[in-house]
């Protein structure tokens, strides 16, 4: 797996955090995958902490820096769980299907991928 970071002032800490999280999730040695992590000043007019988009080959994670650093790391953990979900094919790239079941009409808090990400983000 190739991991690229952009716009983080605490690169060494973020790299260690990501490496440990990927190893914990047992996806640190995936071949032919790219993980791009970008830090921006804010998302969605300051309301969103982060988001992930991707598929089985590449995931892009964006983290907002207008929150405390520890919250940024928690958000990064949450989005890394989504990365694992994309890489494994559990989560569709259009964020509507989980394990081939359509959840396009489900509320945010009822989406299985969000339930899983919230469950494990603090581990």
Language-model-detected regions and their locations in the chain:
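Short pre-active-site segment immediately N-terminal to the catalytic Zn-binding motif
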Residues: 60-76
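Zn2+-dependent metallopeptidase catalytic core
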Residues: 9-32
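Short helix/loop segments within enzyme catalytic domains
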Residues: 121-123
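Hydrophobic beta-strand residues in large extracellular and virion-surface proteins
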Residues: 3, 18, 35-37, 59-63
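Short active-site segment of divalent metal-dependent hydrolases/proteases
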Residues: 77-85
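Catalytic zinc-binding patch centered on the HExxH motif and its immediate surroundings
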Residues: 36-60, 69
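Post-HEXXH active-site segment of zinc metalloproteases
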Residues: 70, 74, 86-115, 119
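Hydrophobic or amphipathic, alpha-helical segments that drive membrane association/targeting
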Residues: 1-9, 13, 33-45
